[in-house]
């Protein structure tokens, strides 16, 4: 009885898949216990004819795995010898040239915002004022006799 119910439910499943347009597997199953045969019924419908277009191989395969041919590939070239040399060149120029010469360039950049110059200039003025007996700092930044004020009206 259970085998008969299984055969009936399998036929219903195949028929439902065929009516909804789902691909139904063309399976024929035979039970070894009850000798019940489950096969797709005629209700499942016929498959639509397959397209008649000719299959053509892609002239340039996009998903070629370079690691199958060269397990030590660095991703620069398909040829293993060129791949190693390209990797060496990239690392030589990337590390040696850019890091070494780049850090040398940054080290010799001019004084940023003239901090060092302003410090040296202040020290020079302090030494000059101490040597001539002048006060180190004055209350007036500008000479008051040289400032021209507008007349009061």
Swiss-Prot record:
<dbReference type="InterPro" id="IPR019329">
    <property type="entry name" value="NADH_UbQ_OxRdtase_ESSS_su"/>
</dbReference>
<comment type="subunit">
    <text>Complex I is composed of 45 different subunits. Interacts with BCAP31.</text>
</comment>
<keyword id="KW-0809">Transit peptide</keyword>
<keyword id="KW-0249">Electron transport</keyword>
<keyword id="KW-0472">Membrane</keyword>
<comment type="function">
    <text>Accessory subunit of the mitochondrial membrane respiratory chain NADH dehydrogenase (Complex I), that is believed not to be involved in catalysis. Complex I functions in the transfer of electrons from NADH to the respiratory chain. The immediate electron acceptor for the enzyme is believed to be ubiquinone.</text>
</comment>
<feature type="compositionally biased region" description="Basic and acidic residues">
    <location>
        <begin position="66"/>
        <end position="77"/>
    </location>
</feature>
<dbReference type="GO" id="GO:0005743">
    <property type="term" value="C:mitochondrial inner membrane"/>
</dbReference>
<keyword id="KW-1133">Transmembrane helix</keyword>
<keyword id="KW-0999">Mitochondrion inner membrane</keyword>
<keyword id="KW-0812">Transmembrane</keyword>
<dbReference type="Pfam" id="PF10183">
    <property type="entry name" value="ESSS"/>
</dbReference>
<keyword id="KW-0679">Respiratory chain</keyword>
<feature type="transmembrane region" description="Helical">
    <location>
        <begin position="89"/>
        <end position="109"/>
    </location>
</feature>
<comment type="similarity">
    <text>Belongs to the complex I NDUFB11 subunit family.</text>
</comment>
<protein>
    <recommendedName>
        <fullName>NADH dehydrogenase [ubiquinone] 1 beta subcomplex subunit 11, mitochondrial</fullName>
    </recommendedName>
</protein>
<feature type="region of interest" description="Disordered">
    <location>
        <begin position="40"/>
        <end position="77"/>
    </location>
</feature>
<dbReference type="GO" id="GO:0045271">
    <property type="term" value="C:respiratory chain complex I"/>
</dbReference>
<keyword id="KW-0813">Transport</keyword>
<keyword id="KW-0496">Mitochondrion</keyword>
<feature type="transit peptide" description="Mitochondrion">
    <location>
        <begin position="1"/>
        <end position="29"/>
    </location>
</feature>
């Amino acid at each position: 009885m259970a085998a008969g119910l299984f055969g009936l439910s399998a036929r219903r499943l195949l028929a439902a898949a065929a009516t909804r347009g789902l691909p139904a597997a063309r399976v024929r199953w035979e039970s070894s216990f009850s000798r019940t045969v489950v096969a797709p019924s005629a209700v499942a419908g016929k498959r639509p004819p397959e397209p008649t277009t000719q299959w053509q191989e892609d002239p340039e395969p996009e998903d070629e795995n370079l690691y199958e041919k060269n397990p030590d590939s660095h991703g620069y070239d398909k040829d293993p010898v060129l791949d190693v040399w390209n990797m060496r060149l990239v690392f030589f120029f990337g590390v040696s040239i850019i890091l070494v010469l780049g850090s040398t360039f940054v080290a010799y950049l001019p004084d940023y915002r003239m901090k060092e110059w302003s410090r040296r200039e202040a020290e020079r003025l302090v030494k000059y004022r101490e040597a001539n007996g002048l006060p180190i700092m004055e209350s007036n930044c500008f000479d008051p006799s040289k400032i021209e004020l507008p007349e009061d009206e």
